[in-house]
Amino acid sequence: QIFDIYQQILVNMRLMYQKCRLVHADLSEYNLIMYKDGEIYIIDVSQSVEPNHPMALDFLRMDIKNINDYFQKKKKIDVFLEKEIFKFVIEDFDVLVKDFGDSEGPKEVEKDNFSDYKKENQYNAEGLMKLVGNLKLKLDEEDEKQDEIFRNLHLMRDLNSLEEQDFKRFREGKIDVFKTMVVDHRANKQEIA
């Protein structure tokens, strides 16, 4: 049951981001309430920021870390990789189905029926629970290192966020493609150049 609660919180984070267009920015076990029906509610959202806030992606990473730390250290369960959770929260539904769907579920939806499937499931907690369950678990020291690397990455929304040193590294041939440095995120539905 603890693992289900953990997954439900991740689904709520996605719904908050995708539907409400908010990042909590201070999410931890102290901002969660479990109602008697077993439903989890996220509270204390007054400091939440919109996805286009300059620090929104960093806040989201910290929210993910806080939730993972709580469930891993206090509740002693295996948790998902932080980068996988991040992707689960911010990606378009189509990408989620492609990356996290399984052969028995969403991946097998025919192209003709996908728009109907998307309408029914992109904000449906039950459907999202099936997808979140397919994220990769953090099981060893290598996974822990990957989380540490992800936490320390400088995330950028667009090319305007690049610093002069990044352009210098590009000219010197130390960076092949700028797009790999930019979070593939379309909060305003703008394509990344």
Summary of predicted features, one role per range:
Residues 69-193:
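Regulatory N- and C-terminal appendages and interdomain linkers associated
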Residues 27-34:
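Hydrophobic residue at the +6 position relative to the catalytic HRD Asp in the kinase catalytic loop
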Residues 1-23, 35-36, 41, 50-94:
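ATP-dependent phospho-/nucleotidyl transfer catalytic cores
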